[in-house]
């Protein structure tokens, strides 16, 4: 890749982790530990690149376009184990939490472990109303708890009924809050309207493929419009309209 510097990004409220990393890094090396504000979605790769280097990945571009590569810490550990120890990726750490979880914790589990087994390990104070693969903002609801942990499962969120609210898909009131909170500086309300009308050229013009599906727009929407689901559908519309790749 031709990269000569490495930055390890850690949220600034993880002081123990920052101290531990600095203790094991040669101060004369090209590896630095960067303490970044604990705000969401700071961990998205384009946000990390801008926060650490000041470079902005162009719309539709990849980190390589600005001379960067971003790797999750878990991925780096898996690469190390595979290359240096000859160990395949057979386990991963999964954060299990939620409002009805009795003992929230990080668990090192074999890939293939069912979500049911995770629920039994942490305990819950009532029957789960909704189980998400992922966190509360970007997680995807699961309808069958026999689904397994995969290499991409980083969290399981278990919610009770009190955190459920009905989504009636009312009309947008054009308050503009979704645009204020979008970390990619997109126009969610315009994208939502374009998706509902099936206007693929407009979706492309609005840069819907740059949406990182962080959920900030849906979280702040006073009309409780399911914006993220709409944008996922819109992105699929755009991809379906693209010419097939050669080769």
Q: What is the role of each PLM region?
A:
Residues 1:
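Histidine-anchored nucleotide/phosphate-binding helix
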Residues 4-115, 121-126, 135:
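Hydrophobic alpha-helical positions that pack around
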Residues 9, 95, 106-108, 132, ...:
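Structured core elements
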Residues 12-14, 135-138, 196, 238:
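Acidic, glycine-rich active-site loops and adjacent beta-strand->loop/helix elements
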Residues 41-42, 48-56, 84, 123-173:
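Active-site gating/interface segments in enzymes
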Residues 112, 117-119, 131, 182, ...:
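Short alpha-helical segments in extracytoplasmic peptidoglycan/chitin-binding modules
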């Amino acid at each position: 890749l031709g990269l000569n510097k490495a930055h390890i990004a850690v949220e600034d409220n993880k002081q123990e982790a920052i101290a531990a990393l600095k203790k094991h890094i040669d101060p004369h090396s090209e590896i630095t530990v960067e303490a970044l504000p604990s705000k969401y979605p700071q961990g998205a790769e384009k946000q990390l690149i801008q926060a650490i280097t000041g470079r902005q990945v162009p719309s539709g571009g990849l980190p390589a376009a600005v001379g960067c590569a971003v790797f999750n810490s878990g991925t780096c550990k898996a690469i190390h184990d595979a290359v240096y120890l000859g160990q395949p990726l057979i386990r991963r750490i999964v954060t299990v939490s939620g409002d009805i979880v009795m003992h929230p914790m990080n668990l090192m589990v074999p890939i293939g472990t069912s979500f049911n087994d995770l629920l039994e390990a942490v305990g819950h104070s009532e029957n789960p109303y909704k189980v998400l693969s992922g966190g509360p903002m970007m997680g995807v609801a699961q309808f069958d708890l026999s689904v397994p942990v995969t290499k991409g499962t980083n969290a399981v969120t278990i919610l009770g009924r009190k955190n459920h609210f009905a989504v009636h898909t009312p009309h947008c009131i054009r308050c503009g809050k979704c645009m204020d909170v979008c970390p990619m500086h997109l126009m969610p309300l315009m994208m939502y309207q374009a998706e509902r009308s099936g206007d693929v050229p407009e979706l492309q013009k609005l840069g819907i493929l740059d949406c990182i599906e962080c959920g900030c727009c849906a979280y702040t929407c006073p009309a409780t419009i399911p914006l993220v689901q709409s944008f996922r559908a819109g992105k699929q519309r755009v991809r379906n309209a693209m010419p097939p790749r050669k080769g």
